[in-house]
């Protein structure tokens, strides 16, 4: 066996070695990484390796299976490995900081990787402090048109408020948003920008959507994590008895599923109309919009639990036919049946799986607090 094959075999054994963490990407957690940084000593996935290529002074990558590895490189990988290197570069990641997963957008992964290895923000000797107040300009989509305009945003973390102004030196904010009602989620495809962020909050019983971006990836991710820090501060005050580990999933959330379906009205005789749907698992709401970038939803369906009589059925009620799309599903609530059609069987399966996941899960502490506050 030549050096090439012998070293490839050693690397593949390292990927499987127990207690190393090498079986998942060191940066996003994707399973079965087949690339590695021989300068840092970590195994990474193909997508994250593309980010590493952007700073060759700090990281240099090779394919585990396709590239040639000399003995010294393999020795370096053997003496390091994912868990060992993560212990160094992720020693002090703040609780509020969003650590991206494999399914997250590129800007989150890129800034996480740069923060770790290039800026070395999370080393043991670095002091960790919350971002605090923040002020700056973001490009915001107009409520009634598709034009993005430069707007000044101000985050007051201690007061738990986010404000934005239409005039750069304006004294009166266009909106004052309470952090307790705020969510932020990257929606790059929907917004059509690689740094696109969707901020939502409750306004007069509806969900107001703000679509923003910044030309700098670092700037938009810093804004995102500053909002998360303010959210965590609020949650600690709202739930003083809950451990931080239970609060972290409540800081911000992504939609469980989004996409187009067609819906009919409460009598099931109304014409089916195409709408954009977004499933919010934490607030247990299925929101629908005329268009994906609308400022407000047209309506929503609250999703309780199976124990409360909420169900989702595959298919349409007998005698009901969709408009263009023939496959569908029916959501049963104590008040009525909601009937939807899906463009494909794949979409139908994904909606059924997502909806059933919400209906089978217990209500979160945040939702229980919101419900008790409303009933009180």
UniProtKB/Swiss-Prot annotation:
The protein's name in its UniProt record: Arf-GAP with dual PH domain-containing protein 2
Effect of residue 275 to C: No loss of InsP4 binding. Almost complete loss of InsP4 binding
Annotated keywords: Cell membrane, Cytoplasm, GTPase activation, Membrane, Metal-binding, Repeat, Zinc, Zinc-finger
Keyword Protein transport attributed: no
Annotated compartments: Cytoplasm; Cell membrane
Tree of life domain: Eukaryota
Organism of provenance: Rattus norvegicus (Rat)
Signal peptide positions on this chain: none
Residue ranges annotated for the PH domain, each copy included: 131-232, 254-360
Organism taxonomic ancestry: Eukaryota, Metazoa, Chordata, Craniata, Vertebrata
Gene for this chain: Adap2
Pfam families documented for this protein: ArfGap, PH
């Amino acid at each position: 066996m030549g050096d090439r094959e012998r070293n490839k075999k050693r690397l593949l054994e390292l990927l499987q070695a127990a207690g190393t963490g090498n079986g998942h990407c060191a940066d996003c957690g994707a399973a079965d990484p087949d690339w590695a940084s021989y300068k840092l000593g970590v195994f990474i996935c193909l997508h994250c390796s593309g980010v590493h290529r952007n700073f060759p002074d700090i990281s240099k990558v090779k394919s585990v299976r396709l590239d040639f590895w000399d003995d010294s490189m393999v020795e370096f990988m053997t003496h390091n490995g994912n868990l060992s290197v993560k212990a160094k570069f992720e020693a002090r990641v703040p609780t509020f900081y969003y650590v991206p997963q494999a399914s997250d957008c590129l800007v989150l992964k890129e800034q996480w990787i740069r923060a770790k290895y290039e800026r070395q923000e999370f080393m043991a000797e670095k002091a960790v402090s919350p971002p605090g107040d923040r002020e700056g300009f973001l490009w915001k989509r107009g409520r009634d048109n598709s034009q993005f305009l430069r707007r000044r945003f101000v985050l007051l973390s201690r007061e738990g408020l986010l404000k934005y102004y239409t005039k750069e030196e304006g004294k009166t904010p266009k909106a004052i948003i309470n952090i307790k009602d705020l969510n932020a989620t990257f929606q790059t495809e929907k917004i059509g920008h690689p740094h696109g962020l969707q901020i939502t909050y409750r306004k007069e019983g509806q969900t107001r959507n703000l679509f923003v971006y910044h030309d700098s990836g670092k700037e938009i991710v810093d804004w995102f994590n500053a909002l998360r820090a303010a959210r965590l501060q609020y949650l600690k005050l709202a739930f003083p008895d809950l451990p931080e580990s239970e609060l972290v999933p409540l800081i911000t959330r992504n939609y469980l599923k989004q996409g187009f379906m067609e819906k009919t009205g409460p009598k099931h005789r109304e014409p089916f109309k195409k709408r954009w749907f977004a499933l919010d698992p934490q607030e247990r709401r299925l929101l629908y919009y005329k268009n994906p970038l609308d400022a407000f939803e047209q309506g929503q369906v609250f999703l309780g639990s199976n124990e409360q009589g909420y169900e989702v059925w595959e298919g349409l009620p007998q005698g009901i036919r969709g408009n263009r799309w023939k496959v569908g599903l029916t959501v049963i609530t104590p008040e009525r049946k909601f009937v939807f059609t899906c463009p494909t069987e794949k979409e139908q399966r994904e909606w059924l799986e997502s909806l059933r996941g919400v209906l089978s899960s217990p209500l979160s502490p945040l939702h229980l607090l919101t419900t008790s506050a409303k009933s009180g």
